[in-house]
Amino acid sequence: MRTNSTTSGPGVPTLEKKNLGRIAQIIGPVLDVAFPPGKMPNIYNALIVTGQDTTGQPINVTCEVQQLLGNNRVRAVAMSATDGLMRGMEVIDTGAPLSVPVGGATLGRIFNVLGEPVDNLGPVDTRTTSPIHRSAPAFTQLDTKLSIFETGIKVVDLLAPYRRGGKIGLFGGAGVGKTVLIMELINNIAKAHGGVSVFGGVGERTREGNDLYMEMKESGVINEQNIAESKVALVYGQMNEPPGARMRVGLTALTMAEYFRDVNEQDVLLFIDNILRFVQAGSEVSALLGRMPSAVGYQPTLSTEMGSLQERITSTKEGSITSIQAVYVPADDLTDPAPATTFAHLDATTVLSRGLAAKGIYPAVDPLDSTSTMLQPRIVGEEHYEIAQRVKQTLQRYKELQDIIAILGLDELSEEDRLTVARARKIERFLSQPFFVAEVFTGSPGKYVGLAETIRGFQLIFSGELDGLPEQAFYLVGNIDEVTAKAMNLEMESKLKK
């Protein structure tokens, strides 16, 4: 892995004023810069504009070269606000792409797209940096072992299991619980696996980023007393930042994760929230650069940009990067080019349903729409596969019967169908689960349920032993033993009321 050991600051290699240009034009976050003949910077080189604005305030803006225009001009996209910049200002070509700090010193810290710490905890204690633009690992370096990554969330582990070193997409519209599910996964994985995580906040709400940071401090994932014991590095390029920053912040987070995989030889978790904002930022930049839009107004380079990010997220013989990506689905339309392009790269999809969220079933994971390439008997075993298929068949039959129930009522169903409906409603509720990160809001303590416990629970439901229990007993519990305990409590309460 290519790293630099000398820098003058996180985002920029050592500056030697050998290649200077001047700003010729400014259009929002896009700068046209004129350089002397024969001194043109390369595509993706970092350019730095320093100086003072009209009020005497210092200016330090980093840009990235995107196009060579001819006539000794380049077009670059700024990574921060361009307020105060003027034509004629001096621009320094750093001669290299953006580089960010990597290694153990990044854990417990919050960075921006340039790799500068933004948490007011002082400079990062590392001299090792790495460029954010790299090629994906060669075929000969890839690892092809298939193993399950247990999350402790029943519906995920049973019906759409995650692959260790795979790519997982969380699909859902606005407000169905993507970010809460990501926070729960970070919490469970840090506690159960002791793994290192990198979180890339791409174009999401600043408030959510702040909430996540506070939540991590409370749960001990970030250790304030001893920052070196923290389990996660955070990289934010939020909604209020220019499109250049939002387009590149995913690469900054990925570069930090790659170092843990390639040099430290660790298994790493990379969370990206939200991959659609990465696409949207690319679309904005594409329009600013004057490219003709493609389908639904997206950039013509959508597949290429997505591929350059996704192909670097993989397992090598040194270690693995397991990536969990939230994918906002515009207007709940899964055929939109952005989610459709993302689908092609994923090993598992966790689809969040507005219908389940409206019923109050959380996590609102749709058991029929969520998929995984890992759900095969040779990988998960016959027992797991059989139970998962029975759960899906029961829920599918319930879905088919809902129209009949709505028109004619339950009484018109056959005895067999009535039993199917009763069990399906219990399964639906048993797939809900109290989360550790939602304890503050729900008042229920979070539950981590191992895969073996989950399978045992559904076996008991299908055996008929629990047919007499009320369906409320299955709602927001951990394992099946809690269901019987809750049913007894409900029975006691109803007797006391009488």
Swiss-Prot record:
Membrane topology, as annotated: Peripheral membrane protein
Enzyme class: translocase
Keywords: ATP synthesis, ATP-binding, CF(1), Chloroplast, Hydrogen ion transport, Ion transport, Membrane, Nucleotide-binding, Plastid, Thylakoid, Translocase, Transport
Any Pfam family the entry gives: ATP-synt_ab_N
Catalyses which reaction(s): ATP + H2O + 4 H(+)(in) = ADP + phosphate + 5 H(+)(out)
Binding site for ATP: 172-179
Any one of the GO CC terms: mitochondrion
EC number in record: 7.1.2.2
Annotated localization: Plastid, Chloroplast thylakoid membrane
Main location as per UniProt: plastid
Self-association state and partner proteins as the record states: F-type ATPases have 2 components, CF(1) - the catalytic core - and CF(0) - the membrane proton channel. CF(1) has five subunits: alpha(3), beta(3), gamma(1), delta(1), epsilon(1). CF(0) has four main subunits: a(1), b(1), b'(1) and c(9-12).
Function: Produces ATP from ADP in the presence of a proton gradient across the membrane. The catalytic sites are hosted primarily by the beta subunits.
Family: Belongs to the ATPase alpha/beta chains family.
Name of the molecule in the record: ATP synthase subunit beta, chloroplastic
Annotated source species: Beta vulgaris (Sugar beet)
